[in-house]
Amino acid sequence: MRIGDEQLKIQKIDGFSRIYQAECFPNEFLTMMGKNKGEQARYLRWLYTWLAVLDREGMRALDLSQFEYLRETDNPRLFAIRHPHSQINERYIYIYEAGESAILLTAFMEKSKRDYDFAITRAKNILKELEESDDGTSL
């Protein structure tokens, strides 16, 4: 699984039983947040709070305003975690694997519809790279 020159893998996020991330996700989060360590910590705490809900509730989390199914995506079906009252309007796109585990794919700030379109394309490219593993196996 390669994006650019790097091997792309899925990593389990410590502290959760069913939450994973594409290996590139932490860097995308940090790039989105910029260099302000205080802001990084604050938004990471917020994200982890909602990842705990996602870990516990699975698909039922979609009943909450922080979670949404991206209707324009059917194959694959993508989902997003959103921070409704955030000043930076950050979003985290993920997918369900086998209906149970969630895999975080990308993080971005939504300033316009084009930002969402770009992030969806990015998430699909990451997913494609994950599915096309070097050993011929898929997710």
List each language-model region with its residue ranges:
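Basic, Lys/Arg-enriched alpha-helical interface segments
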Residues: 1-89, 98-102, 109-139
